[in-house]
A protein has these predicted regions:
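Asp-based phosphoryl-transfer active-site loop
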Residues: 1-7, 84
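Short, contiguous strand/loop micro-motifs
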Residues: 3-4, 71-72, 143
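Short beta->alpha junction loops/turns
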Residues: 6, 77, 149-150
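Short, flexible helix/strand-to-coil boundary loops that buttress conserved ligand/catalytic motifs
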Residues: 6-7, 42, 66, 157
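Short alpha-helical
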Residues: 8, 36-37, 151-152
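Short secondary-structure boundary/capping elements
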Residues: 8-12, 54, 125
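Active-site phosphate-binding/coordination module
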Residues: 13-114
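Conserved acidic, metal-coordinating active-site core of Asp-based
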Residues: 87, 91-177
Length: 177
């Protein structure tokens, strides 16, 4: 793991990665976070300078940091957003968010909880609450993020796997997501 429990790259790790890049090694970092959420870490280990890569959204997006080119991008079928939103809101009573990297914001439907606030802070993005999340999404989406109490999220994962597992990858990235 690149970052510690404090979500920071240690100085020793930073120096080792930079040294490896100086020796000609190519570095890629992978995260479940959005591109915006990884940019500070990428800058800290100087991926842009050395031509490294960022793999965001649990592998759905790959960016060449030197050129800024997106070399791989797998988005959700837009027709899946409404059923997942309805399941989150009506069946489960959960917060659901969508990253909008171009605007450096997190769109939140069905309210904002402490977990959404923590994610926005960690990713250095703003939160924009919307009344109709499905209608507000007029851009490609890589990931829908549901949040709630850890014990409840275990059941949520099971429920959503049963409901959408044949069409979507459903998993928890943290106890509360």
């Amino acid at each position: 793991t690149l970052v510690g429990t404090d979500k920071q790259v240690s100085e020793a790790t930073r120096e080792a990665i930079i040294e490896a890049q100086q020796r000609g090694k190519t570095v890629a970092i992978a995260s479940g976070r959005s591109i915006s959420g990884i940019r500070r870490t990428a800058a800290k280990i100087r991926l842009e300078q050395f031509g490294g890569y960022v793999i965001a959204y649990n592998g759905t997006t790959v960016i060449n940091c030197k050129t800024g080119e997106c070399i791989y991008n797998q988005t959700l079928d837009h027709d899946m957003i409404k059923p997942v939103y309805e399941a989150a809101e009506k069946e489960l009573g959960l917060g659901i968010t969508v990253y909008h990297d171009e605007e450096k914001e997190l769109l939140a439907g069905n309210g904002v909880d402490a977990y959404i606030e923590a994610d926005a802070k960690a990713c250095d993005i703003t939160i924009r609450e919307v009344n109709d999340l499905v209608r507000a999404i007029d851009f490609p989406v890589n990931k829908l993020l549901l949040s709630g109490e850890p014990e409840k999220m275990k059941q949520v994962e099971k429920h959503l796997c049963e409901k959408f597992g044949d069409r979507l990858n459903v998993f928890r990235s943290d106890p509360y997501y």
